[in-house]
Amino acid sequence: MSRRYDSRTTIFSPEGRLYQVEYAMEAIGNAGSAIGILAKDGVVLIGEKKVTSKLLQTSTSTEKMYKIDDHVACAVAGIMSDANILINTARVQAQRYTFSYQEPMPVEQLVQSLCDTKQGYTQFGGLRPFGVSFLFAGWDKNYGFQLYMSDPSGNYGGWKATAIGANNQAAQSMLKQDYKDDVTREDAVKLALKALSKTMDSTSLTSEKLELAEVYLLPSGKVKYQVHSPESLNRLLTESGLTQPAAETS
């Protein structure tokens, strides 16, 4: 019965469902996991890289983490070509705001603007939804550090800790148990690594399969976006007790 209603994005089924939007969300369920944690002194983003070839130029390529503006970054799960379009759109919106008002764009306003674009692709004929979910991490003078999650429908919400992608339920369950409101950035990194290990085969948890980024404030008050190097990731994995013997010899 559903096949009569799922060919177009603009037609509701008798149950009130938009099947193409639901299918887009299913595509994200097969993508590499991404986790975001809001700490009292920053925001931590971590993601599972699916492309781990030795031939890849890792120094110039990021699969999961992207900088949108000096004060906002995001982690991605889903179809990367769709994500690139939306990331570029967000960057342009942020620059236009800065040019017009001479100050950084508020984080939630940027997220809402991008989600309006995503929602439009669920409402007009001849278009398909963007098959990608985002975790946005940022800081502004209005609300301080913030973490938002958005899905293909254009819906978004603020979170203290959340996960998207494959096996995100396992990560969500661990975050519910272990997250504390006064968590520091250092402890948030350890919790993020621990939660991501639950979504992956823990024996394959190596720096080559991870991307870790942080958004925090420098003593000068400037927002800093930092992506960890493979060496830093290896050290963090060792400190967290997540590095397996097989990974150390590879």
Curated annotation (Swiss-Prot):
Subcellular location as annotated: Cytoplasm; Nucleus
Alphabetical UniProt keywords: Cytoplasm, Nucleus, Proteasome
Cited SUPFAM superfamilies: N-terminal nucleophile aminohydrolases (Ntn hydrolases)
UniProt keyword Protein biosynthesis, yes or no: no
Purpose of the protein: The proteasome is a multicatalytic proteinase complex which is characterized by its ability to cleave peptides with Arg, Phe, Tyr, Leu, and Glu adjacent to the leaving group at neutral or slightly basic pH. The proteasome has an ATP-dependent proteolytic activity.
Family, per entry: Belongs to the peptidase T1A family.
Subunit and interaction comment: The 26S proteasome consists of a 20S proteasome core and two 19S regulatory subunits. The 20S proteasome core is composed of 28 subunits that are arranged in four stacked rings, resulting in a barrel-shaped structure. The two end rings are each formed by seven alpha subunits, and the two central rings are each formed by seven beta subunits. The catalytic chamber with the active sites is on the inside of the barrel.
Protein known as: Proteasome subunit alpha type-4
Biological source species: Spinacia oleracea (Spinach)
Protein's gene: PAC1
